[in-house]
Amino acid sequence: MNDQYVQKTSKDGYRSRSAYKLVEMDNKFKLFQEGQKIIDLGASPGGWSQVASQKGANVVALDIKPMNAINGVEFIQCDIINEFEILREKFKDQKFDVILSDMAPESCGLKSLDHIRIMLLCEAALNFAKHFLSHGGTFVVKIFQGESDKDFCNELKKMFKTVKYFKPKSSRSESTEMYLVSLGFIGSKPSI
């Protein structure tokens, strides 16, 4: 594959090209500080968890798929939608400084359907953030551009001081993938 980021992953020791997307976001938005508590949703294979951990954060990685261990990262294999109550019991009243979501559905090839499916994952990630994100915290979520991403962005603007669209240079140019970087959580009522 002629993809400079795929080629760089083995040289730089990252598990996935997506690590570079998070590095770009951190360079622009200063997402991480040493000692922060971070949740990485859709973590497997672990590129984002690696980046956050290398920044000195305490990372809990969640994914429905298995993930090989990363030094200093706690991994929980689970479905954040169907096992939400189990996670709520596990984390109880814990709050996290940053919640990252690079979750994406398996692509079916129909852009409109893929958009709907990722927006459902975005809503699940946001519900998770409503429960577990600390006041002033940061929420980063992957979206596919489509008819409802602006509505989702407007929903975020009611809960965060700043919300920005970001397309990393390391994203494939033909991809509709973008990220919403939401800073300064001011709160909202969880839906469940």
Curated annotation (Swiss-Prot):
Pfam family, one: FtsJ
Taxonomic superkingdom: Bacteria
Cellular component, GO annotation: cytoplasm
Keyword Transferase: yes
SUPFAM superfamilies the UniProt entry points to: S-adenosyl-L-methionine-dependent methyltransferases
Recorded catalytic activity of this chain's protein: uridine(2552) in 23S rRNA + S-adenosyl-L-methionine = 2'-O-methyluridine(2552) in 23S rRNA + S-adenosyl-L-homocysteine + H(+)
UniProt binding sites for S-adenosyl-L-methionine: G46, W48, D63, D79, D102
Location relative to the cell: Cytoplasm
EC number: 2.1.1.166
GO molecular function: rRNA (uridine-2'-O-)-methyltransferase activity
Record keywords: Cytoplasm, Methyltransferase, rRNA processing, S-adenosyl-L-methionine, Transferase
EC class (word): transferase
Keyword S-adenosyl-L-methionine applies: yes
Primary residence: cytoplasm
Active-site residues, record numbering mapped to chain: K142 (proton acceptor)
Family in the record: Belongs to the class I-like SAM-binding methyltransferase superfamily. RNA methyltransferase RlmE family.
Summary of the function given for this chain in its UniProt record: Specifically methylates the uridine in position 2552 of 23S rRNA at the 2'-O position of the ribose in the fully assembled 50S ribosomal subunit.
Record's protein name: Ribosomal RNA large subunit methyltransferase E
Taxonomic lineage from the root: Bacteria, Pseudomonadati, Pseudomonadota, Alphaproteobacteria, Rickettsiales
